[in-house]
Amino acid sequence: ALMMKPGDKSGPRDAYFLDVQKALIAAGIAMPTMVVDRTRLNANIDTLKGFLPPGMGYRIVAKSLPSLGLIDHIRKRTGTGRLMTFNLPMLLEISQAMPEASQLLGKPLPVQAARQYFEQLPLEVSGAADNVQWLVDTPERVMQYAALADEFGRELALNVELDVGLHRGGVVPGEVLGAMLAAIKAHPRLSFAGFMGYDPHIPSLPTAMGWRERAMKGVRKTYADALVQAGGVFGADAMAGITRNAAGSPTYRTYQDTEIASEVSAGSCLVKPTHFDTELLEPHVPASFIATPVIKSLPVTHMPGLEFADGATRAWNPNASKTVFIYGGNWLADPVDPPGLEYNKTFGRSSNQEMLNGGPDLEISPDEFVFLRPHQSEAVFLQFGDIAVYEDG
């Protein structure tokens, strides 16, 4: 049993986080805040650019970086005009702020949402709609978008979602894909924009016995067969200019030539939440943190109704010695500084004042900051107001 006894994880604070804390206090920030480190973000952008093979395009995944300022900065540093968007508000916002940007839908939008896009798009940025590629996954959806094109008298560029092994919908080469391509070709207001094949399942497959390698070959074969099938319908000239979109942050490094994909999508690897701590993304560094003020810092942990067990709990687990209550909480995130902080499973989570416990060497006062690393960026970033950009103190 002593083998299972937790060791004390508390200790001195990380100098990096003390510097960020100093900057937050100097800026007068006193509420839960999403912090993005510009130096680290830029390093991640440069890492991504460095891994792209010659001729490979890059598309920014807007849902993973849900801030126009952030997207604009990444566009400038990468020189890309390509974005992947995922819902109606995002599509409208980017169409107005960046009407010249190419937007590829990352999931098929219900046709009613696409209709609302055309209804709500301001006249002065009407041309932004010509830069949108609408994702379609079934023959039925192609027909819905054909009717929409007629309704608004607009030409729509359709991108076909391929199932390259994720099995989250999309189509495989064969009869159904043939019907979709034929329907697009037959309609005067529809054009074939290309394919999207998303493969985030790859890194979770074991490398043992060649499983991952086989799956990657499967991705490439499915994509290659779809390209051949589309070439038979539209001809070589039309195929030369299509979008061949692939990957995501977890797999962009596996595309080492432009034989299959002409562009890769990525977003999360630029801020690197914990779900992206994978071997392929090891060269990327965490660049986003939740910073939240300490409301109360207590020298001893007392559990409501279980006070009789407090001493025994501390003796068994030194990391339960002290308590802090933070401003807010219950985020998809893990505490990273001060070191050794843990959620209290017995007390439970709280969105108002979350309890965190630490060991005997935990030193933090009210109004100082606890730092947490988000698990993902897309949902977590949107829970905060303006992003605080940190750079060299």
Place the predicted regions along the sequence by residue.
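Generic N-terminal amphipathic, Lys/Arg-enriched alpha-helix
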Residues: 2-5, 16-34
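Active-site pocket-lining/capping segments in soluble small-molecule metabolic enzymes
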Residues: 17, 166, 196-203, 261-270, ...
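Glycine-rich tight-turn/loop motif centered on a GG-T
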Residues: 26-37, 101-104, 122-134, 206-217
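Conserved, mostly hydrophobic/aromatic
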Residues: 41, 63, 94, 160, ...
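Active-site-proximal beta-alpha core segment in soluble small-molecule metabolic enzymes
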Residues: 58-204
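Active-site loop/helix belt of alpha/beta enzymes
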Residues: 157, 163-282
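Active-site loop ensemble at the mouth of alpha/beta enzyme cores that anchors a bound cofactor
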Residues: 214, 250-325
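C-terminal accessory subdomain/extension
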Residues: 300-393
